[in-house]
């Protein structure tokens, strides 16, 4: 995995998320980040003037690359008091939480009554194109692994292939080669096309006490394999997203209870108009 490329994508996505956050919450607001990874985005949020606490599992994929004081937690209970934060933020994380539905209650707990949640989540398009990219990635990784046996430098992709060969039985290895693995915690690589669609994410949020304030995309095209990496610029990836679909949803949520409270406190305009008409 090209960490510089991943970091560049996350920077571009966070710029978009920051626009959503800044339009709703002032600088200096408190943020809880779930799945902080290497801490890149937590650092960027801090530089933008927000107060950030970022949490992740101790054995997360990017734990060896942390650039921010990520706090370890058990994946269930956020070590923070009730109503501690103005904003909950995650980037490509919720799909990796097996108990994603019940975890929404924990996000509700640590958010203030008027808090918002901003989540970046993979799309159905990302899943489709990641399935398609599996085989070009295998060719690339296999070629790099072969060059490594001839004394060349072994790339990250070649390391993935080598580990797959070492750790799997023949049946598992054939399956891993022929089929793209699932990315998240629900279904398989094919059914994730539905699991990652808005038809699954939107009801999940609405059924767990949220109101969807807005839903957009990151406006970028990429796959889970990053076969071309920086050979495709961000500008090219933005253009491709219009043709092939964007890779991430951007959801902005508020507590449904807060939405109801705001509605209840608003003046009953329609009733007032009717009353005047009756007079």
Which sequence ranges carry the predicted segments?
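Conserved aromatic-histidine-acidic binding/catalytic patches
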Residues: 5, 9, 33, 37, ...
């Amino acid at each position: 995995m090209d960490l510089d490329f991943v970091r560049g994508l996350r920077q571009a996505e966070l710029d978009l998320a920051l626009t959503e956050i800044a339009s709703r919450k002032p600088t200096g607001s408190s943020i809880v980040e779930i799945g902080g990874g290497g801490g890149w985005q937590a650092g960027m949020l801090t530089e933008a003037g927000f107060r950030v606490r970022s949490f992740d599992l101790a054995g997360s994929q990017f734990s060896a690359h942390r650039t921010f004081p990520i706090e370890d937690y058990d994946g269930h209970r956020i070590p923070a008091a009730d109503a501690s934060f103005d904003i909950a933020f995650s980037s490509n994380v919720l799909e990796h939480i097996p108990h994603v539905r019940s975890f929404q209650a924990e996000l509700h707990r640590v958010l203030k009554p008027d808090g918002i949640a901003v989540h970046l989540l993979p799309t159905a398009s990302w899943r489709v194109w990641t399935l398609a990219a599996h085989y070009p990635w295998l060719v690339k990784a296999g070629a790099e692994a072969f060059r490594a046996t001839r004394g060349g430098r072994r790339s990250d992709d070649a390391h993935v292939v080598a580990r797959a060969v070492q750790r799997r039985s023949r049946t598992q290895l054939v399956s891993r080669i022929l089929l793209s693995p699932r990315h998240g915690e629900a279904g398989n690589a094919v059914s994730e096309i539905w699991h990652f669609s808005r038809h699954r994410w939107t009801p999940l949020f609405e059924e767990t006490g949220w109101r969807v304030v807005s839903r957009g995309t990151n406006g970028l095209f990429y796959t889970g394999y990053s076969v071309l990496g920086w050979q495709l610029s961000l500008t090219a990836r933005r253009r491709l997203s219009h043709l092939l679909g964007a890779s991430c949803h951007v959801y902005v949520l508020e507590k449904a209870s807060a939405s109801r409270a705001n509605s209840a406190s608003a003046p009953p305009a329609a009733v007032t108009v009717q009353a005047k008409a009756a007079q």
